[in-house]
């Protein structure tokens, strides 16, 4: 079930350019700080926005072009950090707007 979730998360982020085994290893390493429910909610909400989909598609092309595993790790980690910061800032801004 965990492997299935990791592969599905990879598909959701448009980075299925590499084999499922590598996808599983990378997501096990980088998704430690995310709970499954939060990560799923966060990605599904963000992928509805067109600009983020284009952003991830651009990363997908870069990853497909490079066969270097370290480049893939860097790209995936960058995407995780970007999504995490974006959601945290968005939640805080919405809280401040409610207070005002």
Curated annotation (Swiss-Prot):
It comes from Saccharomyces cerevisiae (strain ATCC 204508 / S288c). This is Uncharacterized protein YDR114C. May be involved in growth at elevated pH and presence of calcium.
């Amino acid at each position: 079930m965990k492997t299935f979730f990791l592969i599905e998360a990879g598909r959701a982020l448009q980075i299925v350019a590499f084999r499922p085994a590598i996808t599983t290893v990378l997501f096990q390493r980088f998704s430690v700080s995310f709970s499954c429910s939060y990560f799923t909610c966060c990605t599904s909400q963000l992928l509805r926005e067109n600009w983020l989909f284009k952003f991830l598609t651009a990363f997908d092309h870069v990853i497909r072009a490079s066969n270097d595993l370290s480049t893939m790790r860097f790209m995936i980690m960058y995407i995780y950090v970007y999504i995490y910061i974006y959601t945290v800032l968005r939640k805080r801004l919405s809280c401040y707007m409610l207070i005002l």
